[in-house]
Regions:
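Short C-terminal tail/terminal secondary-structure segment
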Residues: 1-3, 149, 228-229, 240-254
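Alpha-helical segment proximal to the catalytic Tyr-Lys
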Residues: 129, 173-177, 237
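Active-site helix of classical SDR
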Residues: 124, 160, 168
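Substrate-binding pocket helix/loop in short-chain dehydrogenase/reductase
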Residues: 100-101, 105-113, 205, 209
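Residue(s) in the substrate-gating loop at a strand-loop-helix junction
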Residues: 144
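Conserved glycine-rich cofactor-binding loop
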Residues: 10, 17-18, 41
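Short, small/polar-rich loop/turn modules that mediate ligand/substrate recognition or access, typified
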Residues: 90, 176, 181, 239-241
């Protein structure tokens, strides 16, 4: 199991104070890494830190606005100052506004791209400078099954998540010789605050997803933990530029 041991590593998870981000932070921490949680809501940050510390995970948090380059740069630098280095970056911060294309205001549409895609560029660019100091690193970008499909009432979301996959491939191609592996995870329908609202808006969604998904159920945030540990560990040293669906088989069911 040493192949998956993250002892002595430092991981930063944006949007790490709930849902998929918190589940990944927990799994990475349980594998031995020290964890930095970043999010806009300081109360949620603090509660998440308390949870991880109760599991004997070394953890701190920072407030960040991932749509602001200076805030992202400060976050990365502060994480390094806190623990002396950075080895793993999980770009998980995300948002959505569900509307028909003609109903969006341009600023709403741009705000989704800024949060879901541009923030990954900004944080990864800064992290690269610190990864070079420790001989490499791991970047995990959180896409979506809607990286592969066009989401109804989600043109900005689908565009941003499709961009995540191509950004991941480009980073991987560029930074491979720097010993930096960059991969994407594409969650399916996971039971989070975001998807709970979707089920309110679309009452038939619950049953529809369960019927189409070979696993026969919605995912739990903890279902993402194993993939996060794999992509953070030495076990994935020869894996880069991939986009791994974690969706109970939804995406193979055409």
């Amino acid at each position: 199991m040493k192949l998956f041991d993250l002892s002595g590593k430092v991981a930063l998870v944006t949007g790490g104070n709930g849902g998929i981000g918190l589940a990944m932070a927990k799994a990475i921490g349980e594998a031995g890494a020290s964890v930095v949680i970043a999010g806009r809501n300081n109360d949620k940050n603090k509660k998440s830190v308390e949870l991880l510390k109760s599991l004997n995970i070394e953890c701190i948090s920072h407030i960040v606005d991932v749509t602001d380059e200076n805030s992202c740069n400060s976050l990365i630098d502060n994480a390094v100052n806190d623990f002396g280095k950075l080895n793993i970056l999980v770009n998980n911060a995300g948002t959505n506004i569900r509307k028909r294309p003609e109903e969006y205001e341009l600023e709403e549409w741009k705000s989704i791209i800024d949060t879901n895609l541009i923030s990954m560029f900004t944080c990864s660019k800064r992290a690269f400078l610190h990864f070079k100091n420790v001989g490499g690193g791991k970047i995990i970008n959180i896409g979506s099954m809607h990286s592969l499909f066009g989401a109804p009432l989600g043109s900005a979301y689908s565009a941003s998540k499709g961009g995540v996959v191509q950004l991941t491939k480009s980073f991987a191609n560029t930074w491979a010789r720097d010993n930096i592996q960059v991969n994407a995870v594409l969650p399916g329908y996971i039971d989070t605050t975001l998807t709970r609202q979707a089920r309110v808006d679309i009452p038939e969604l619950q049953k529809r997803v369960e019927e189409r998904t070979p696993a026969g159920r919605w995912g739990d945030p903890d279902d993402l933990g194993g993939t996060a540990v794999f992509l953070s560990s030495n076990a994935s040293d020869y894996v880069t530029g991939t986009a791994i669906p974690v969706d109970g088989g939804y995406s193979i069911n055409g």
